[in-house]
């Protein structure tokens, strides 16, 4: 929504945490967000909607993880995903993430169940 977009694009928010991802033709394909929590990097990501479901997810995720490993040198990664997003969960599992716990989170006008996943760097 508009508030989320304004937050993501605001200079105060980005401060070395949010990164745009471009393809070889310099077209925007998505974004990554990284937050260091001790030796763990919490990861957020988004892929341009017209690119989802086309087999790009794993390569996109692996590129972001490689970038974060080089930049932040974590010992592990953590992410959270809505439990209804089964396609993303399959990609995260293929990338080596394992379920850690589920929790409820208020977002976008409702309360949704999320799955926290982790993997070694």
Each model region followed by its residue ranges:
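Conserved glycine-rich acetyl-CoA-binding loop
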Residues: 45-62, 82-90, 94
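Generic, low-specificity signal for short hydrophobic/alpha-helical stretches with a mild N-terminal bias
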Residues: 3, 63, 73-74, 99-100
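C-terminal "cap" of GNAT-fold acetyltransferases
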Residues: 74-89, 94-95, 101-121
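Acetyl-CoA-dependent GNAT
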Residues: 1-52, 58, 67, 71, ...
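Sequence-level detector for tyrosine residue identity
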Residues: 18, 22, 60, 92, ...
């Amino acid at each position: 929504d508009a508030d989320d977009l304004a937050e993501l694009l605001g200079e105060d928010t980005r401060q070395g945490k949010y990164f745009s991802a471009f393809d070889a033709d310099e077209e925007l394909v998505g974004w990554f967000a990284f937050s260091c929590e001790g030796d763990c990097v919490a990861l957020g990501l988004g892929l341009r909607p017209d690119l989802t479901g086309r087999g790009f997810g794993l390569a996109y995720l692996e590129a972001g993880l490689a970038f974060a490993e080089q930049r932040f040198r974590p010992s592990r990664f953590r992410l959270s995903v809505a439990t209804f997003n089964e396609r993303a969960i399959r990609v995260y599992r293929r990338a080596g993430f394992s379920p850690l716990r589920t929790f409820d989170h208020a977002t976008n006008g409702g309360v949704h169940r999320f799955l926290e996943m982790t993997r070694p760097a």
